[in-house]
Curated annotation (Swiss-Prot):
UniProt protein name: Probable heme-iron transport system permease protein IsdF
Cited CDD domains: TM_ABC_iron-siderophores_like
GO terms of biological process kind: siderophore-dependent iron import into cell
Keyword check for Transmembrane: yes
Predominant place of localization: membrane
Gene Ontology CC, one term: plasma membrane
SUPFAM superfamilies xrefs: ABC transporter involved in vitamin B12 uptake, BtuC
Family indicated by similarity: Belongs to the binding-protein-dependent transport system permease family. FecCD subfamily.
Species in which this protein is naturally found: Staphylococcus aureus (strain bovine RF122 / ET3-1)
Keywords: Cell membrane, Iron, Membrane, Transmembrane, Transmembrane helix, Transport
Transmembrane spans: 9-29, 61-81, 89-109, 114-134, 143-163, 179-199, 233-253, 267-287, 294-314
Gene responsible for this protein: isdF
Swiss-Prot/TrEMBL induction comment: Repressed by fur in the presence of iron.
Source superkingdom: Bacteria
Compartment list: Cell membrane
């Protein structure tokens, strides 16, 4: 009981930190806001500075929160589905496949912009299925599976590089220049994906069982691995549709959360949601304040943090002979 209470208290503290960070992000930038500006806006309904920030900065903050949460949860789900602690959508090529589909859709069927998350999901599904088929045939260990994923990532990024030589297929990536329609599109996918994940989290711990144990209790482990993998691909692909590729969030956050609260997915999923949202928001905030008026992409900061962590996890997996 005491451990449960500690986890609840920690979760509430993280929520407070997340809200505080969102507020700091909202008032910080080339246009700075004071508390008086906000007070004037909410009492009189009129403040030009606040109005401009609501249109320019608030969509960016909301998208950062949703994308961070979705990528963190996607990473946790992929690791459960593939039984691989190194799995992450960007590393195994899912994000690249989704980005190629996004580019093709924007060129040939731009009128379907509001369906980009679903169309990107189709693109992200292809490399995931390739990984599954190859793994079922060759039974890769954790590191070998990641190497195959990296090969797919390189291949698909090469295809993407060729496609984007066409000026009509240039893809804006990152959190800049986001508008409210982007928020609405992503919010639908975020709500759907995260609600389904919370429902599925009741069964995720059983994915650690082997096939014999699962069958002995009547649990269809293959079906749930597929459902978990598909949901992970959907969450990651939906973020790609709006912000492009963001590296390593899906591998950093689940491992940090496991260190904090253990591997129970009923606890891991909510914590990953909050910490993932906070981490991307912090990366975006740092990118805006380190060298103003220039902006460092949040993805660059994530890569600086995530690269060493991936090396550490690979070394650890080799040591444990995963």
């Amino acid at each position: 009981m005491m451990i449960k209470n500690k986890k609840k208290l920690l979760f509430l503290c993280l929520l407070v930190i997340l809200i505080a960070t969102a507020y700091i992000s909202f008032v910080t930038g080339t246009i700075k806001l004071s508390f008086n500006d906000l007070f004037t806006k909410f009492t009189t309904g009129s403040n030009e500075a606040v109005d401009s920030i609501i249109d320019l900065r608030l969509p960016r903050i909301l998208i950062a929160l949703m994308v961070g949460a979705m990528l963190a949860v996607s990473g946790a789900l992929l690791q459960a589905a593939l039984q691989n602690p190194l799995a992450e959508a960007n590393i195994i090529g899912v994000s690249s496949g989704a980005l190629i589909m996004r580019a093709l859709c924007m060129l040939f069927i731009p009128q379907l912009y509001f369906y980009l998350p679903l169309l990107s999901f189709i693109g992200g599904l292809i490399p995931f299925l390739i990984i599954i088929v190859l793994h079922s045939k060759f039974r890769f260990n954790a590191v070998s599976m990641i190497l195959v994923g990296v090969a797919l990532f390189v291949l698909l990024n090469g295809v993407l590089e060729i496609l984007t030589q066409n000026p009509l297929m240039k893809i804006p990536q990152g959190l800049t220049m986001k508008i409210w329609s982007d928020v609405y599109i992503l919010a639908v996918s975020a709500l759907l994906g995260l609600i389904l994940t919370l429902l599925l989290s009741l069964k995720l711990n059983l994915l650690n069982l082997d096939d014999v144990q699962a069958r002995s209790i009547g649990f269809n482990i293959d079906r749930y691995r597929w459902l978990t993998g598909l949901l992970a691909v959907f969450l990651a692909s939906a973020t790609v549709a709006i912000v492009g590729q963001l590296a390593f969030l899906g591998i950093i956050v689940p491992h940090v959360v496991r260190k904090l609260v253990g591997g129970n997915y009923r606890v891991l999923i909510p914590f990953s949601t909050v910490i993932g949202a906070w981490l991307l928001l912090v990366a975006d905030l740092l990118g805006r304040v380190i060298q103003p008026p220039l902006e460092i992409p949040a993805n660059a900061i994530l890569m600086i943090v995530g690269g060493p962590m991936l090396i550490y996890l690979i070394c650890q997996s080799q040591r444990n002979r995963i």
